[in-house]
Amino acid sequence: MSTDSQAPKALRGVGNFIDDRFHLAKTGEKNLRKVFPNHWSFMLGEIALYSFIILLITGVFLTLWFKPSMQEIVYDGPYERLNGVLMSEAYASTLHIDFGVRGGFLVRQIHHWAALIFVASLVVHMLRVFFTGAFRKPREINWLIGVGIFTLAMLEGLFGYSLPDDLPSGMGVRILQGVMLALPLVGTYVSMFLFGGEFPGEDIISRLYMLHILLLPGILLALIVAHFMILWHQKHTQYPGTGRTNKKVVGTPMFPGFAVKAGGFFFFVFAVTVGLSAFVQINPIHLFGPFTPTSITSGLQPDWYMGFMEGSLRIFPNWLDFQIFGYAVPIGVLVPGLVVPGLIFGGLGAWPFIERWITGDHRAHNVADRPRNAPVRTGVGVAGIVFYGLLWLAGSNDILSHTFSISLYWTTYFFRVAVIVGPIIGFVVAKRICLGLQRRDRETLEHGYESGTIQQLPSGEFIEVHKESSAETVHVLESKEEVDRIDAETISSVEAATDANGVEAPAARGLKGRLRAKLAHWYTKDNVSFEGVEAHTGHHLHHGAAEEKEPAQAH
């Protein structure tokens, strides 16, 4: 029997034809052997990618029947409860998708759920990158691309949410227009340009539709491709462990291991999305009715990722508004609607460079930090989460007041204080927890772990025997990088910032240098040092008992 496993002659001919022109054989072989680390948190980015693919597929389906027009018609369709109601063609076509197209309601639900999962997975993925320091050199550009993807994803979701022209989406567009009007000097012109006249105008749906299906998806697709190309070139970060270094990645090769896992995970994400869409209804526009400028309702909430902006608008005081030369400057809308999101996204994008400037760390990092080993960074991240979460809850202050029978004014006052105090408390608590975990790690590295075995010494004292940690655990604990702490005395002393001739160090000159020194001290002053700590080994297991036996024998 022949054991020849060569491909058929026709396929070999095609393969040789392509390889002779593009030389893909060696490149393909190398890429197929590329190693990906094995850890569940690295699949969070995969969820975002797969959700985006689902969005593209379902979005193409929906565009076949959706009509982006604000032309008013009298509805006469399959949803009988709204027959005879005046509505836009956009809303009527959405009702047709839900009730007139077979499977249309399910596809629209899948599209909406995929959008929510897409943004959620982006958030969790970015949190993983932030807390592990995976944004550091050489990945600053990829971090900026990720922030751009996150920002555009929120805008894309907002515009898509506004297309059906039902009551909640119309209210969202009205809030958007109010934020645009808050722009000093140019706000009115920007609003008129986008809406084609006074609100609601006749062009906003068609213009948002163009942005939603063409411009923003194209930019998102380009950024996602760039993100993965950079990731492929720079290699993946990995958590500390045996054999894992800045130059060596330990994991599963691209083919067949990772490819099979990724393919199966895509179908899992798709199945979960379809399951949610089939059994958990979301955004039932047929129950809300068409939007009219004179209509409003209570209890409605935007998609979760826009809740922080609504909360910011609700709790920000309006007594800060003022006028300049007769022009109103509505601080109560301008700051929560534009400044707060700008600070959030701007802070995210700038953080890698801020941290590098403070610490002076210009090294390349391919091994991720444990969050506990960067207590200030972790504290800042927790403070940001608390700030975002409180704003998100503030967007439901009316529902909270109604549910718990609390005055709306009191919930508003509470959130005004909480968004300032809460992040500070979150930072302090998270930092102290990280420092406590560092001390426990140092003790585990030096003395081993508690075995649960109690031993009595000759003196009558009882101790718990510690056992040697595994090699993997020791490697993880020893992966903590030593951070040089800057003493407060060093900063406050003029002599410490000068050389032997009394010349001030260039880095310490001026306000900028002194500010950096203060921040560096704050960033590193409490870090627990592992310097000089040796891993616990077997011959140290009973050192406490041995020390007690020697004086007993002397007697």
Model-found features: residue ranges?
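Short linear, low-complexity motifs centered on an aromatic residue
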Residues: N318-G337
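Membrane-embedded alpha-helical bundles that constitute the cytochrome b-like, heme-associated redox core
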Residues: M1-I315, V335-H555
